[in-house]
């Protein structure tokens, strides 16, 4: 029997991450586009020859694919657990049964100071984080004494759906 999803949230990267990635992709493609005459004001090369940047294109394709697959954090709360999944393909997943949760609360924290940034991170102080942007999170106090921060735009909306200890 499948547990019913009681709450679901998708949190994507900040706008500036998208802008930086777009800039890098365009900067990498610019030389070839110029050689083909696809940039206004630059004359087409008489002999563009074979694509000299094939390894670069391959690298860009892999980066764009990786970015597309890993572009968001999905948080789901079911009747029995919290489920985390990274990306559209949900290749990286984590399940936290309510029986392993001792407490849950919404917090404001410093991702840079506490974890060195965003993403899936670990701290030497027994804390870990799954975040994509911002400084708001659902903090889960786990039975083993560790804490898990789950990035959220509005973590206070998640708290009522969590039943610590499986109650």
Residue ranges and their predicted role:
Residues 71-87:
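Membrane-helix interface/capping segments
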Residues 148-167:
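Cytosol-/stroma-facing membrane-proximal "stalk/adaptor" domains immediately downstream
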Residues 56-72:
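Transmembrane alpha-helices and immediately adjacent membrane-cytoplasm interface residues
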């Amino acid at each position: 029997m499948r547990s019913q999803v009681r709450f679901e949230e998708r949190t994507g990267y900040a706008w500036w991450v998208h802008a930086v990635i777009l800039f890098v992709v365009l900067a990498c493609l610019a030389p070839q586009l110029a050689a083909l005459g696809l940039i206004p004001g630059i004359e087409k090369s008489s002999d563009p020859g074979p694509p000299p940047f094939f390894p670069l294109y391959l690298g860009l394709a892999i980066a764009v694919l990786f970015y597309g697959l890993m572009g968001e954090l999905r948080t789901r709360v079911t009747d029995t657990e919290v489920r985390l999944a990274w990306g559209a393909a949900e290749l990286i997943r984590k399940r936290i049964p309510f029986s392993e949760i001792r407490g849950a609360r919404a917090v404001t924290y410093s991702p840079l100071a506490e974890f060195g940034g965003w993403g899936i991170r670990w701290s030497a102080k027994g804390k870990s984080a799954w975040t994509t942007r911002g400084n708001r999170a659902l903090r889960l106090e786990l039975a083993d004494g560790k804490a898990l921060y789950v990035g959220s735009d509005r973590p206070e909306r998640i708290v009522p759906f969590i039943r610590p200890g499986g109650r």
